[in-house]
Each structure stands twice: as C-alpha cells, then as structure tokens.
C-alpha cells in the first residue's frame, strides 16, 4: 500500500498519516514531507520524502535497515538522536545524516524542526516540534511520558497538534497521554502509540470531561488527516 500523500496541503494546513501502532507519522506541509519513526512498513511504500526524523533507538522507533532503504529510494535527509545516529552511521551517507539533541533546531527548506527532551527510558531520546512554512505547529512526543516543562512549552508554542502516547511504552496510559495534552493545551490532541482503540477512547473521554477546549482525533492507521492552524484570538 502506497503511504505517500499525493495531494498538497493548502496554506495554513498540514496532512498527516499514522503509519503503525507506535509513533510512526507521515507529515506533509505545503512544500515538504517528513516521516517520523518509520517502522513496520515497506520502503517502497514511502516516496517523495524530504526527511526522516528518529526519536530514539528502540525497535518500535528505529529500524536501521528500513531507514537505509528509504533513504536510498528518496535521497532524503535523516535527523536522529545520538544513540540512533550511531546505529545509522553505516546505513546512511554521512552527508545525509544529522545528529540532533534537545535544544537544537534545523531547517528542512521552510520547515523548522526543533528537538526537545523526552521522558522515556532510552539513551538520548528526543521529541520534535515541527513548524510548517505557515507556522502550523506540531509536537511529536515520541512515546514520552509527561514532564513539567511541557506547560511552558505549550504556552510558548501554541500547538495546533500534539501526538499523545496512550499505551505500549513503559508507564504510558490514557491518563499519562491526557496529562501531556493538559500541559501543552493544543487545539487538537491525537492519541497514538497503542494497540487498542479502547485506550484511545479512554483518552478522548478524559479530554472531553476535563479539557473541552482541546479537540480529539482518534486516528486510523494509513488514513490521511488534515489539520489547520489555530485561529488567533
């Protein structure tokens, strides 16, 4: 199944696809296409890719052989945390591989990618703030648990979309996912990194009852979704 998004988003919008039951996301802005933590898919199903972003070295986030195959097919850049960068040194050309740490940011054309910390038991995990050309702000939290700095980050960034882990990872639950949404206060929260719809529904119920200003979208894998920039007050 081809997972590429053929249509180009209009100004002030982005498209995304949930690629697997983990934190695999395909994100398309008006000019760039990014894949975050791609695993459990075939390289030939991802085309026209500008960059791969890796959050950490665990099997459900990094498949070095798959990253190598995708990179060869698309000639995309690869951004990765320190531990994943080591695993990718022999898989990706040095000119296409960039190590990234919390606090660092880079540009992929008009798209800005900033790495932030992650509360997860990996060697040097990161989360990513992705800002489109039109300043649509997406926060990919990998499978991080909540951490206090999220509140200030949410206030500063005014996120349009935050992905919230609700299962599978150590300590992760609908409640911990809700806490990420509560701290960051995005316009839209998407529960992911789970093998059950029940956990996503529990997250949605918590959001509805306690954070009514944040909408919830429960994604289906491989389906394309559109997200628009929040309205300024």
Per-segment meaning from a language model:
Residues 58, 84, 119, 145, ...:
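Catalytic metal-binding/acid-base residues of hydrolase active sites
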Residues 75-76, 158-163, 168, 174-194:
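Proline-aspartate-enriched helix->loop->beta-strand connector
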Residues 65-70, 91, 149-153, 176-180:
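A short acidic, amphipathic alpha-helical/loop segment
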Residues 33-34, 51, 161, 188:
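Short, Asp-centered acidic motifs that coordinate Mg2+ and/or phosphate
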Residues 40-84, 156-163:
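Active-site metal-binding motif and surrounding structural segment of the metallo-beta-lactamase
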Residues 23, 59, 84-85, 104:
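Alpha-helix capping/helix-boundary segments
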Residues 92-108, 153, 178, 182-233:
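Binuclear metal-ion centers of metallo-dependent hydrolases, dominated by the metallo-beta-lactamase
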Residues 1-47, 99-157, 172, 219-233:
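Core dinuclear metal-dependent hydrolase active-site scaffold
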